[in-house]
Amino acid sequence: MNNIPKLKFKYLTLEETSDILSWTLKDTDNILSVKEGTLFLYPELKRLTKEDNIKDIIQDRYNNFIKENNNLREEYTTIWNEYNDKYMLEISNYFNIKWPKEYKEISVGIGLIPVCPRYIKEKAFDIHKKNKEELIDTCMHELCHFLFFEKCKEIYPNWKYEDFDSPSLLWYLSEIIIDPILNSDGIQKIYKHKFKCYDIFYNVEIDNINLLDKIISIYKNNSIETAIKESYNYLKEHEEEFIRKCNNK
């Protein structure tokens, strides 16, 4: 019998929120621009000094967010449960791998944050406030990452957790393949929606060939095992040019 994970929504604590914001303020990734997003959401952090405590600065806004959105956990659970089982089974079929038994429950933290970080070891990810369409998009996006990395463990036995985080090529690939996988026929039958990866990937050309056109073709015309190997090898072959163009350098 297939294991079908469930999502458990919760509110991020003040400390968890502070830790995420602290991480984003140190980030220099041109693809995500998470620092910019944090300063837009929290302009008061532009004046942050080494002596300041982020928790103290954001505490009032955190408390107001929790007070004003105390029904989000139940609302999100109701919205997502309509799709959970069908999606979990279909994405499992696509990757030709069962959800590992450790994935009984996946924690989803809700907070006043500008990003949606995921935690592979902890089997969790975080989100900010979203409408129904954004919520489903984000949950399907993040869950696709989890099973993609499980498939990579199977294909690449010498894997390590660092392979699944930025700036590794497998991390880049995990973000790019959101387009061909979530726009596949099986997923679209469950939720009709145009899924997109990060905008910057659509503008990358290698040897005068559009990156997304190349990757989409690979996933459309091959088994998932072959597609992952071929797309990863393609990025490795053009790694220097790919990274440079992704970072606008």
Residue ranges and their predicted role:
Residues 1-78:
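N-terminal low-structure segments adjacent to metalloprotease catalytic domains
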Residues 10-12, 152, 158-207:
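Post-HExxH zinc-binding segment in Zn-dependent metallohydrolases
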Residues 123-139:
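Short pre-active-site segment immediately N-terminal to the catalytic Zn-binding motif
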